Structure formats: C-alpha cells, structure tokens
A protein has these predicted regions:
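Alpha/beta-hydrolase-fold serine-hydrolase catalytic core, especially in secreted/extracellular enzymes
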Residues: 25-116, 121-129, 229, 295-299, ...
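Cap/lid segment of the alpha/beta-hydrolase catalytic domain
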Residues: 135-206, 240-250
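Primarily recognizes the serine-hydrolase "nucleophile elbow" in alpha/beta-hydrolase
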Residues: 192-256, 264, 268, 279-280
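Structural recognition of the beta-strand scaffold that forms the well-ordered cores
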Residues: 133-136, 151-156, 210-212, 232-237, ...
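Extended catalytic-interface subdomain
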Residues: 211-214, 236, 270-275, 279-304, ...
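Fungal secretory targeting signals
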Residues: 1-24, 415
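Mobile cap/lid helix-loop segments that gate and shape the active-site cleft of serine hydrolases
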Residues: 238-290, 312-320, 326-332
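Flexible loop/turn segments at secondary-structure boundaries
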Residues: 143, 160-162, 218-220, 241-246, ...
C-alpha cells in the first residue's frame, strides 16, 4: 500500500470515529447584552480559557471548543477590545496591478476606500510555481525572506487608517462613526491586500500566508490573524499590551500597561476597553485568550530580551505557556512558537530569528531550532492555576480535529 493511500484511509477512519460537523453542537448562551466592566469579579491570575463567559459552563471536547467556545471568544474580544469587525460579505473588492504595485478599491454601502500595496517576488515565482507570502506593515527584512523563497507584500497602513484619532484612509472612508480600534482597521487592510493577491497575483500562493508587524503593528498583525481564517501564520513582533503582552502581569518594571496604553493611544482599541482602566483584573480574557482563539493556525511570538517596555518576559513566561496549554490540548502544540532573541525593540534581527519557523509552516522545511524554549526565563505556572484542569481528551484522537478544521477554517474569509 502506497503512503498516500495509507494516509487517505487513516484520515477517513479518524473522521468516521468523530461526531460529524453536521451534528449541531448545543452551545451555552453568551450573556446578552455583554456585561459591563463592573459586573466582573477581579481575578489576579489568567482567566481559564475553557470557561465560558457565563462563568459556569466549561468546555469538555475539542469539537465544543471549535464550535462554541472559540466563536464566543471572538465575539467577546470584539466587544471588549477590538470593536466589531465589518461585515465583509457587504464589501466588493477590486484590484488592478501595474508591475509590482497593486491598487486596491473596496466598496460598501455606497462608499469607496482605496489604498495600494507593493509586491516583492522571489526568484522563480510563477503562476505554475507560486510562492508563499508574508504580508507586512512597518518594514521587514525583505532580502532574507526573498532568498528563502517567500514573497513579501507591504502596504502603507496609514493609508488604511492613521495612527491617531483622525478618521482618514480607506477604512474610515467606509466605516467612520463605528467604535472600532485602529488595530482592527489595520487588520482589515491586511485582509483586503490578501483579497487583491487572490485576484491579481497568480505568482503568490494565497493559501500560504503570513502576516507581520512590530510593536503597535505587531498588535495589528495579531488582530489580522484573529479575524481572518485564511491567515496561515500570525507573526506579532514585540507586540506588548493589546497584543500578546499580558494585562495582569507586568514583569519588566517599566512596561506598557492598559492605563498608559489607553492614555497614549486610545484609538488603537475601542472605547469599551477604556472602561477597564485601573481594573484590568476584571477583564474576562487576557493575551493567552487571543492566541488560543487563533488555534489551530500557527503563531510565532517574537520577543527581545532587551525590550522591557512591551513586557517581553511576561509574554514569554505567562502568555506563551498558558496559550500552549490550549494548543497542546487541541493536538496542535507545534503550531505555537516562541522566538526569544538578545536584541531590543523591533530589531530587524527579529525577522530572521523567526524565519526557520516561517519556512517550516509555509514551506514544510524542517528546522532544528527549539521554538518552545523560554530561556533565559522559566514559566510562571502560578499565573494559570487551571493548567491541571484541562478537559479530558484521548491522546490518540487529538490530531484528528486539526485535520478537519484546518481546511474549513483556512478557506473561510474574514468575519
């Protein structure tokens, strides 16, 4: 029996052994309307990601996680942090290509927003042999990625939405008046670039897509991965608070927190998050919840040891191990990576530091690099006391849900 036939039969048997996706999962009701900040009890440790917003129900199976809890997390993250992602089904995206420039137009509700993107293709990329792509904002080490056979597409995020309270740019041309953060607006820009690549750039494989940015743009890249299931790999670099920095743990001594972030750049997120200022321990989620909402798709977290402001240590010893508990339980632990380096904030070396993992995900190129190492730090296990209470799951069945959900999720466009 050939290996391909063997894998086909094995996959079929695994799927037959599990409940059909067509069998509707009965989900606990999400409170409606969503509770206000004062309604939540303070919690010093990370919230249990397996517990629903009602505070009583708990996930028991992987099927339930994907069909019930993960969608609830996406809703509550929009309610309490990002603002509600626009209905993409009401948008019409068109694009024209002139050499290596994409001109993108998005129409919705009788309004139009426009911006552009730049295409950088590796040698040998063609319609017959399309390359994977990383879509980046704010700069990236193009040459390292191009040499590795990965296309790099960039766009000016300020043409989508400014980094200010101003309401200019393509996104606000369509959605002015909505309580939506700039991180979500920039994420929307990533997604519309991907639409344009699908339409006009056959040299790029639009099913193998990474998204990246650093600092506030790393927060935006995280939002891009969160809100579009076509994203294969999310690459938030030094993302800090409202990214993968934990709200409840500031371990650097001078770090970004909810208070100084909302004071300095309140437009990054919606107004509701501001109601948790000085009471972040009431938030019904933390950074690990955001990461878990992206599973089973891949994430690599870049952190510099000499980058205290974005709480690199907190991301490494609190967020990463807590999120990995969920990924491991889902049978996709290898999809979550941590890349600690010696440098500072947004060093270009960060992009080469994560490149072996990028190639493993986007090109199936094996790497010997250990992307689970927390060195020079160690996990703060007291931050997630629920770690010993993961829902039961037969180890032999762990990999099957990943196979079933990968196809369903990566073929689905933004919410």
């Amino acid at each position: 029996m050939g290996p391909y036939l063997y894998r086909t039969i094995l996959t079929a048997l695994l799927c037959l052994s599990l409940p059909s996706l067509s069998q509707a999962q009965s989900c606990p009701a999400t409170p409606s309307p969503f509770p206000k900040a004062a309604a939540f009890s303070t919690q010093a440790t990370l919230p249990d990601p397996f517990v629903y917003l009602d505070g009583k129900s708990r996930v028991t199976t992987q099927e339930e996680w994907y069909q019930c809890r993960q969608p609830e997390i996406l809703r509550l993250l929009q309610e309490y942090q990002f603002g509600y992602y626009p209905d993409h089904s009401a948008e019409t995206v068109t694009a024209t290509r002139t050499s290596n420039t994409l001109s993108i137009s998005v129409a919705a509700g009788g309004k139009t927003g426009t911006f552009s993107a730049s295409i950088n293709l590796p040698n040998g990329a063609s319609a017959a042999a399309p390359s994977p792509v990383v879509i980046a904002i704010g700069g990236i080490d193009n040459n390292a990625y191009l040499r590795a056979g990965v296309a790099v597409v960039t766009f000016d995020y300020t043409k989508v939405a400014p980094d200010s309270n101003g309401k200019t740019g393509a996104f606000w041309s369509l959605y002015n008046g909505k309580d939506i953060g700039a991180l979500t607006a920039w994420a929307w820009g990533f997604h519309r670039v991907l639409d344009a690549l699908e339409l006009r750039v056959p040299e790029i494989n639009s099913t193998l897509v990474g998204v990246t940015g650093c600092s506030r743009l790393g927060k935006a890249a995280l939002a891009a991965g969160l809100f579009d299931k076509r994203i294969t790999l999310t690459m938030p670099m030094s993302s800090g608070i409202q990214g993968l920095g934990p709200y409840r743990y500031s371990l650097s001594g001078q770090g970004e927190n909810l208070e100084n972030s909302k004071q300095g750049a309140p437009w990054w997120t919606n107004s509701v998050l501001g109601t948790f200022v000085n009471q972040a321990q009431r938030l019904p989620f933390d950074a690990h919840t955001i990461a878990a909402a992206i599973a089973p798709r891949a994430i690599v977290m870049d952190q510099g040891q000499s980058d205290p402001f974005v709480d690199s240590k907190g991301t490494a010893v609190v967020t990463y191990p807590a999120a990995k508990l969920v990924y491991d339980w889902l049978g996709v632990g290898k999809q979550l990576a941590l890349a600690i380096r010696s440098g500072g904030h947004c060093d270009n070396s960060g992009y080469t530091n994560v490149l072996p993992f990028v190639l493993q995900v986007l090109k199936s190129t094996p790497t010997t690099r250990d992307y689970t190492s927390l060195s020079p730090w160690t996990a703060m296990t007291t931050a997630y006391p629920w770690s010993s209470q993961s829902p039961p799951q037969a180890a032999a069945a762990r990999e099957a849900p990943r196979k079933r959900y990968d196809t369903r999720r990566t073929s689905m466009k933004g919410n």
